[in-house]
Swiss-Prot record:
Entry's family note: Belongs to the universal ribosomal protein uL11 family.
Ranges in a coiled coil: none
Function description: Forms part of the ribosomal stalk which helps the ribosome interact with GTP-bound translation factors.
CC per GO annotation: cytosolic large ribosomal subunit
GO biological process, one term: translation
Annotated protein name in UniProt: Large ribosomal subunit protein uL11
Organism for this UniProt entry: Caulobacter sp. (strain K31)
Classification via Gene3D superfamilies: Ribosomal protein L11, C-terminal domain, Ribosomal protein L11/L12, N-terminal domain
Subunit structure: Part of the ribosomal stalk of the 50S ribosomal subunit. Interacts with L10 and the large rRNA to form the base of the stalk. L10 forms an elongated spine to which L12 dimers bind in a sequential fashion forming a multimeric L10(L12)X complex.
Transcription among keywords: no
CDD domains: Ribosomal_L11 (cd00349)
Classification via InterPro entries: Ribosomal_uL11, Ribosomal_uL11_bac-typ, Ribosomal_uL11_C, Ribosomal_uL11_C_sf, Ribosomal_uL11_N, Ribosomal_uL11_N_sf
PTM summary: One or more lysine residues are methylated.
Annotated keywords: Methylation, Ribonucleoprotein, Ribosomal protein, RNA-binding, rRNA-binding
Length: 143
């Protein structure tokens, strides 16, 4: 018989640096999950990812206090910041432009994120990434 699911916890954890401190500790502690067990397993699974890369993580907690987790690809904004060299996006979205990104770069990001995006094809995925870029204050240029 399958284990009964108690709930899901969604966190954004930096690769290779999961620690019992907030936000991980309190989120897992509320559900009675072994915090150190999660931290060790997460760090082991993400050792091949560049340290400090934010990874959206969905933790499934079962009634017997055991857990499983799935890490997804880094957020689109992480890739956009990496390409443009920005620390953060525009303060006034829509009125301020902080950098430029090409359609080719958007397509490359869409290819990386395709499995996590709610899109049927690469063009739709690229449009989703384009929306994130515009929200950050990036200008889309043809290349």
């Amino acid at each position: 018989m399958a284990k009964k699911i108690l709930g899901y916890i969604k966190l954004q954890v930096k690769a290779g640096s999961a620690t019992p401190s907030p936000p991980i500790g309190p989120a897992l502690g509320q559900r009675g999950v072994n915090i150190m067990g999660f931290c060790k397993e997460f760090n082991a699974r993400t050792e091949n990812v560049e340290k400090g890369t934010p990874l959206p993580t969905v933790i499934t907690v079962y009634q017997d206090k055991s857990f499983t987790f799935v890490t997804k690809t880094p957020p689109a904004t992480h890739y956009l910041k990496q390409i443009t060299g920005l620390k953060s996006g525009a303060k006034l979205t829509g009125r301020e432009t902080v950098g430029e990104v090409t359609r080719t770069q958007l397509r490359e990001i869409a290819e990386k994120k395709m499995k996590d995006l709610n899109a049927n094809d690469l063009e739709a995925a690229a449009k989703i990434i384009e929306g994130s870029a515009k929200a950050m204050g990036l200008k889309i240029v043809e290349a």
